[in-house]
């Protein structure tokens, strides 16, 4: 991540395993009666993780909070956007981030994450074009060799 995007530092800074374990222990301790704040804290820690299964679980927990607690939706939006960004779900990431920016146009963290999302989409889009172009070139070369070989017979 570039140093020109300090507000999106959450995108690449996981918690230490011991810190995540504290959040997990509290979440598991509360069991069936887990509080919204405990669930949010654990989801936040999971999303910051570099492990894809943790990120997926974090997005799932935040989605539950988003649906069940309308008063907490705004604070879920950024981390839903971040989690989806880290999972490569750029359309979902952009959707959540845009919702947050509609509510808070001056939110520098969301603006910074929006830039990261746009950069990743552009980069992967260019890679996709390069792959398709390379395949087309290879098919053309093979086709040319087959055609040339057929002409010689």
Swiss-Prot record:
Signal peptide annotation: none
Source organism, top-level taxon: Eukaryota
InterPro entries referenced in this protein's UniProt entry, alphabetically: Fis1 (IPR016543), Fis1_cytosol (IPR033745), Fis1_TPR_C (IPR028061), Fis1_TPR_N (IPR028058), TPR-like_helical_dom_sf (IPR011990)
Lineage: Eukaryota, Fungi, Dikarya, Ascomycota, Pezizomycotina
Transmembrane stretches, start-end: 127-147
Membrane topology category: Single-pass membrane protein
GO biological-process terms attached to the record: autophagy of mitochondrion; mitochondrial fission; peroxisome fission
Comment, domains: The C-terminus is required for mitochondrial localization, while the N-terminus is necessary for mitochondrial fission.
Mitochondrial intermembrane-side positions: 148-153
Localization in the cell: Mitochondrion outer membrane
Gene Ontology terms: cellular component: mitochondrial outer membrane; peroxisomal membrane
Database matches in CDD domains: Fis1
One Pfam entry name: Fis1_TPR_C
Start-end of each TPR repeat: 74-107
Residues exposed to the Cytoplasmic side: 1-126
Coiled-coil parts of chain: none
Protein name (Swiss-Prot/TrEMBL): Mitochondrial fission 1 protein
Role played: Has a role in mitochondrial fission. Has a role in outer membrane fission but not matrix separation.
Family membership: Belongs to the FIS1 family.
Keywords of the record: Membrane, Mitochondrion, Mitochondrion outer membrane, Repeat, TPR repeat, Transmembrane, Transmembrane helix
Broad class of where this protein is predominantly found: mitochondrion
């Amino acid at each position: 991540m570039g140093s020109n995007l300090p507000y999106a530092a959450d995108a690449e800074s996981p918690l230490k395993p011991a810190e995540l374990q504290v959040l997990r222990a509290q979440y598991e301790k509360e069991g069936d009666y887990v509080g919204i704040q405990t669930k949010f804290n654990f989801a936040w820690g999971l999303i910051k993780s570099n492990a894809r299964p943790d990120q997926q679980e974090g997005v799932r927990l935040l989605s539950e909070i988003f649906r069940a607690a309308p008063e907490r939706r705004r604070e879920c939006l950024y981390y839903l956007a971040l989690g989806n960004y880290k999972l490569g779900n750029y359309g979902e990431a952009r959707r959540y981030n845009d919702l947050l920016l509609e509510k808070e146009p001056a939110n520098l963290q969301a603006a910074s994450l929006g830039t990261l999302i746009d950069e990743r989409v552009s980069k992967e889009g260019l890679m996709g074009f390069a792959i398709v172009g390379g395949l087309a070139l290879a098919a053309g070369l093979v086709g040319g060799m087959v055609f040339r070989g057929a002409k010689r017979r």
